[in-house]
Regions:
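N-terminal, positively charged nucleic-acid-binding surface of large information/translation enzymes
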Residues: 1-182
Length: 182
């Protein structure tokens, strides 16, 4: 049986799900159902990224710990999919023909990511170094040099100067193999 991998964008549970969340998941669900009808073994995933400054600030504003805050918001996403008639199973459960919902704070997910990063670092594909730049918490993105030195070039909110240690993946090491493959 042919395999088909499909994923929605990963959602940030700093607020309730919205029409954009519903739209992208419904479109992917339609495609997953179609591919199953065509005989594909479909792996259909979605989930929440439960880390970051935006989450910490939203939790603090709500008077909750980040873990309490995201647990409540995660349930809203799952309920939305159920209301839309999309069969969903929350990680690590995996029901056949369902949308697998994975969240980044699940201990199994954290262990898997740690194993992957350790292996990549051992092979020289990940290194740790200091990064300095302007960051927009609202958009959760670093801002390119050469734009407004004070505000985010997308939302217009003030950007923060950030200096921190980060891990960098050497994607350039895979450029030629990827070009050869595709």
């Amino acid at each position: 049986m042919k395999k088909f991998y499909l994923t929605t964008p990963i959602y940030y549970p700093n607020a309730r799900p919205h029409v954009g969340s519903a739209y992208t998941t419904v479109v992917c669900d339609v495609l997953a159902r179609y591919k199953r009808m065509c005989g594909y073994d479909v792996a259909f995933l979605t989930g929440t990224d439960e880390h970051g400054e935006k989450i910490e600030r939203a939790a603090a504003a709500a008077g909750q710990s980040p873990s309490q805050f995201v647990a409540e918001k995660r349930k809203l996403f799952v309920r939305l999919w159920e209301k839309l008639g999309i069969p969903v199973s929350v990680y690590p459960e995996g029901k056949p023909d369902s949308l697998r919902f994975i969240y980044t704070t699940h201990p199994d997910h954290e262990k898997s990511v740690q194993r992957l990063l350790v292996r990549a670092r051992e092979r020289g594909f990940v290194d740790k170094r200091r990064y300095e730049g302007r960051y927009c918490v609202s958009d959760e993105r670093y801002i390119s040099e050469g734009t407004d030195p004070v505000n985010c070039d997308i939302c217009g909110r003030p950007a923060e100067l950030v200096s921190e240690e980060n891990y960098f993946f050497k994607l350039s090491a895979f450029q030629q193999p990827l070009l050869d493959y595709y």
